[in-house]
């Protein structure tokens, strides 16, 4: 029998009891159990995603969330914890290029400022002022998407200005509404994101305290508020922010000096061989001398000299003789050198005639010594 016929045949006084019986029907019980089962499954999957996040398997975490349909505005509205996990994972993810195209598209839709999904997500996140750290992650993700997705400079500049305006407005709302429950660490982080990530990174400008003071000029209540909030006993949020800017400036200067020093060192090493004697013999003598010095030092420290194929003295003497020969052939055996040598020889012979007598006895002495020299050489050869 149809349900309408049953309702028509029931007496009026029994309608309430019939409705009561209908509520206790197995169909409704099964429906409740089905809903509970779905919720249990969703909780299990969410816990699995959380475990992947804790293990720093961020790519797998995001892929799992996409697979089960968690990256959806309806899901975000009904379960903010899923949204918090998604934003945190996207914030940690180094680059979206490692993700699949479908997942990339879902992420870009959530964090691209003018998309309907981003507008709805922004309403959910920025509406809960108590979650400032999650809000900061959301802004960092928007910055990351601007860098990742926009190659046109003009479009990137427009999106940067739009994000700058959104962040400035939110800072004003936050310090106005959260006077007594301000998250000082989160607020400092938010201001530094605005300065270093938006002003410096996206606008491609050098850090300067003027960036902070320009924001304070736009938001007159900002500086007095930050001066009155302390991170520690003697350091206010404003002091910490200005110190961070100064540290960033000093680091940039140090990097710049390091690069310049590296260039100078490369130039020095490139020209260094030209500063020394270009002759190969000079280099050989220096190498031999260095080898001898190192050998002596090792001999003093260990008491034993390293074994070598050639004697160090022989190498040093041979190298020295090569240099001397090279110098002699370059300096003496030329026209001027020969002329000067000849004149000196004539003067010596003329002044010291006694030398001639010595030269007369040289052949006889040589014939006398020659057999002994030959015998000595044969003896050395036989050893």
UniProtKB/Swiss-Prot annotation:
Assigned keywords, A-Z: Endoplasmic reticulum, Membrane, Peroxisome, Peroxisome biogenesis, Phosphoprotein, Transmembrane, Transmembrane helix
Transmembrane parts of this sequence: 332-349
GO cellular component: ATPase complex; endoplasmic reticulum membrane; peroxisomal membrane; transporter complex
Protein name per its UniProtKB record: Peroxisomal membrane protein PEX15
Assembly information from the UniProt record: Interacts with PEX6. Interacts with PEX19; targets PEX15 to the peroxisome.
Molecular function, one GO term: protein-membrane adaptor activity
Species this chain originates from: Saccharomyces cerevisiae (strain ATCC 204508 / S288c) (Baker's yeast)
Protein location: Peroxisome membrane; Endoplasmic reticulum membrane
GO BP, sorted A to Z: protein import into peroxisome matrix, receptor recycling
């Amino acid at each position: 029998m149809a349900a309408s016929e049953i309702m028509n045949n029931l007496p009026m006084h029994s309608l309430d009891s019939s409705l009561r019986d209908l509520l206790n029907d197995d169909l409704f019980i099964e429906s409740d159990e089905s809903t509970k089962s779905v919720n249990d499954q969703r909780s299990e999957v969410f816990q699995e995603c959380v475990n992947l996040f804790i293990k720093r398997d961020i790519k797998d975490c995001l892929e799992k969330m996409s697979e089960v349909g968690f990256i959806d505005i309806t899901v975000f509205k009904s379960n903010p914890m899923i949204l918090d996990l998604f934003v945190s994972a996207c914030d940690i993810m180094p680059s979206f290029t490692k993700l699949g195209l479908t997942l990339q598209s879902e992420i870009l839709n959530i964090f691209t400022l003018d998309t309907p999904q981003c507008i709805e997500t922004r309403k959910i996140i920025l509406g809960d002022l108590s979650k400032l750290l999650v809000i900061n992650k959301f802004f960092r993700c928007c910055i990351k998407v601007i860098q990742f997705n926009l190659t046109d400079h003009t479009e990137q500049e427009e999106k940067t200005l739009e994000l700058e305006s959104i962040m400035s407005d939110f800072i004003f709302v936050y310090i106005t509404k959260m006077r007594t429950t301000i998250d000082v660490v989160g607020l400092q982080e938010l201001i530094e994101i605005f300065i270093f990530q938006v002003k410096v990174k996206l606008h491609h400008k050098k850090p300067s305290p003027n960036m902070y003071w320009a924001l304070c000029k736009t938001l007159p209540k900002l500086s007095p508020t930050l001066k009155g909030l302390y991170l520690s006993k003697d350091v206010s949020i404003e002091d910490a922010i200005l110190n961070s800017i100064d540290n960033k400036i000093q680091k940039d200067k140090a990097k710049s000096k390091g690069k310049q020093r590296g260039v100078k060192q490369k130039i020095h090493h490139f020209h260094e061989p030209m500063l020394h004697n270009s002759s190969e013999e000079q280099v050989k003598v220096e190498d031999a001398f260095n080898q001898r010095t190192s050998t002596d030092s090792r001999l003093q420290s260990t008491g034993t000299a390293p074994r070598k194929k050639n004697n160090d003295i022989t190498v040093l003497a041979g190298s020295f003789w090569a240099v001397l020969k090279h110098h002699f052939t370059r300096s003496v055996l030329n026209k001027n050198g020969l002329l000067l040598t000849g004149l000196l020889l004539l003067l010596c012979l003329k002044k010291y005639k006694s030398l001639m007598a010595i030269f007369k006895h040289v052949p006889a002495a040589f014939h006398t010594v020659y057999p002994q020299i030959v015998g000595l050489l044969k003896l050395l050869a036989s050893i």
